[in-house]
Amino acid sequence: MTDINFGHIHIKLADLMKKQGISISKLAFRSETQRTQLKAYIRNDIQRVDLAVLARLCYALECSLDDLVEYIPPQDTHHS
């Protein structure tokens, strides 16, 4: 496999929680998601995104997926 930088995905959960003034405990309750899993999403420490979790977070935070997830393009924009 080639060593290509495709950029990365940033989960903006911490920003949304701060903006809405919601605690991790309240979000865990509203989204029916474990606190440990939420902490991983807050730290952007996930390798495989669970679409069901994203749907529950969007529902609980009353936001769109676009509000929650952002694609960060690579710094080097030269494609081969």
What do the PLM-derived regions correspond to, one by one?
Residues 2, 7, 40, 69-80:
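Short, charged recognition helix plus adjacent turn
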Residues 18, 43, 73:
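Residue-level detection of the helix-turn-helix DNA-binding "recognition helix"
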Residues 1-25:
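A short, Lys/Arg-rich alpha-helix, primarily the initiator
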Residues 21-40:
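Short alpha-helical DNA-recognition segment
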Residues 29, 43, 70:
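Phosphate-coordinating loops and pocket residues in cytosolic domains that bind phosphorylated ligands
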Residues 17, 28, 58:
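The alpha-helix within a helix-turn-helix
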Residues 45-56:
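Short, basic-rich loop-to-helix N-cap that marks the start of a DNA-contacting helix
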